[in-house]
Regions:
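Glycine-rich, acidic loop regions that bind phosphate or pyrophosphate groups
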Residues: 23-142
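Conserved catalytic alpha/beta core of Sir2/sirtuin-type deacylases, generalized to analogous enzyme cores
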Residues: 4-13, 45, 104, 108-112, ...
Length: 213
């Protein structure tokens, strides 16, 4: 329920935001400050901006190894963390300045404090550039096609027998990222989607978009 409040907060103070697996759809994917999934299974846009951030506000996040890339994602020498969480245990992670409470109420209170100080982030065109790079990558991923013996999967470290064997057994030749892009185009905008294990959840965090909360 805090998604719209978070969006307005980011708009007012020019703060970009990334999404965790659990947080996807809380905010609109089309929002100009949304960078998509963050962390090990995240997007280029989210991770390149997070890498140099000097302050990270984690709203409702457990700050897991996937989200933080085992604490290696945020590489600014003086990076500080602010956590907003209704679970005290998670709020205390990353040696953060912590607020234990409701996300919507806490973000609203934080906005009032920043507004009083006349705060705005120092970003200029970094956000737009990062999003543009990722948009091109999304198009590439959606267009990957199986071309036969000369096909080169995205993942290079693999058993070379796997893809030919899969095609032989199933006659399936659509790639996972292309399939997700096709499903996104075809299903209802407000449909709920459930994924299994393996590489699918990571692809979903990267390439799945939705504006329905």
């Amino acid at each position: 329920e805090a998604g719209e409040t978070v969006e307005k907060f980011c708009e007012e103070f020019k703060i970009p935001f990334g999404e965790t697996q659990a947080g996807k759809s809380a905010c609109k994917s089309s929002h100009p400050y949304c960078l998509g999934g963050i962390g090990v299974t995240g997007t280029y846009a989210s991770n390149v901006i997070a890498k140099d951030a000097d302050v990270v506000i984690a709203i409702g996040s457990r700050m897991s190894d996937f989200t933080t890339s085992s604490k290696r994602l945020y590489q600014h020498e003086g990076v500080k963390f602010v956590t907003i969480n209704n679970c005290r245990y998670h709020a205390y992670k990353m040696d953060a300045v912590k607020a234990v409470g409701d996300a919507k109420a806490t973000v609203t209170a934080l906005a009032a404090k920043l507004r009083a100080k006349g705060y705005a982030s120092a970003y200029t065109d970094e956000i737009a550039k990062a999003k543009a790079v990722w948009d091109e990558e999304m198009k590439r991923l959606a267009g990957i096609e199986y071309t036969g013996d000369d096909f080169e999967p995205i993942i290079k470290a693999r058993d070379p027998r796997t893809v030919p064997e899969f095609v032989k057994l199933t006659d399936g030749k659509i790639t996972q990222t292309a399939a997700l892009a096709a499903i996104r185009r075809c299903i209802d905008a407000d449909a709920n989607i459930i994924t299994a294990g393996g590489s699918l959840p990571s692809c979903m965090q990267r390439v799945w978009t939705t504006d329905k909360r």
